[in-house]
């Protein structure tokens, strides 16, 4: 980010003007992922729309309108529908996922877990639970499980 850009951001009172270059690059990457999936979503839905219009059967005068023509290939139509539906579902899901990650400022699942725990109050409950006294039976059970996991038994 150039100094003139930072000056403009300071003038407009944006807090990102004081951010580190690593943070700015991270946010740019999150934004790029979101917009990539948004563009893919637009492309896939437009593709589905065009395929639907192209396959629409419009009968000529005095032709039956309740039966498709005999040259119609149901297998190919089903394959295109499954592929296009999968593409649309994947791209929209990706857009939703990366948009949420961009809004919450998370880059991986571990950060997402920490953020959700903090938003739902789980970190406070976990701290309270860790500060509680542990009785002897629970401590013995915990030590036994730790020994089992570490391979001491």
UniProtKB/Swiss-Prot annotation:
GN (gene name): AIM11
Keywords assigned by UniProt, alphabetized: Membrane, Transmembrane, Transmembrane helix
Annotated family: Belongs to the AIM11 family.
GO terms under cellular component: membrane; mitochondrion
TM stretches of this protein: 31-49, 82-104
Protein name, entry field: Altered inheritance of mitochondria protein 11
InterPro entries associated with the record: AIM11
Membrane-topology descriptor: Multi-pass membrane protein
Main location per the UniProt record: membrane
Lineage: superkingdom: Eukaryota
Localization, UniProt: Membrane
Keyword Cell membrane: no
């Amino acid at each position: 980010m150039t100094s003139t850009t930072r000056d403009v951001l300071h003038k407009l009172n944006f807090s990102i003007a004081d951010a580190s270059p690593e943070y700015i690059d991270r946010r740019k990457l999150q934004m790029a992922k979101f917009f990539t999936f948004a563009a893919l979503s637009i492309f896939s839905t437009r593709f589905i729309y065009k395929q639907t219009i192209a396959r629409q059967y419009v009968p000529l005068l005095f032709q039956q309108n309740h039966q498709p023509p005999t040259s119609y290939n149901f297998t190919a139509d089903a394959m295109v529908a499954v592929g296009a539906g999968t593409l649309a579902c994947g791209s929209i899901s990706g857009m939703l996922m990366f948009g949420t990650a961009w809004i919450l400022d998370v880059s991986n699942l571990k950060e997402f877990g920490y953020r959700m725990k903090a938003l739902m109050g789980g970190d406070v409950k976990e701290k309270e639970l860790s500060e509680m006294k542990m009785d002897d039976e629970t401590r013995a059970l915990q030590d036994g499980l730790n020994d089992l996991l570490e391979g001491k038994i």
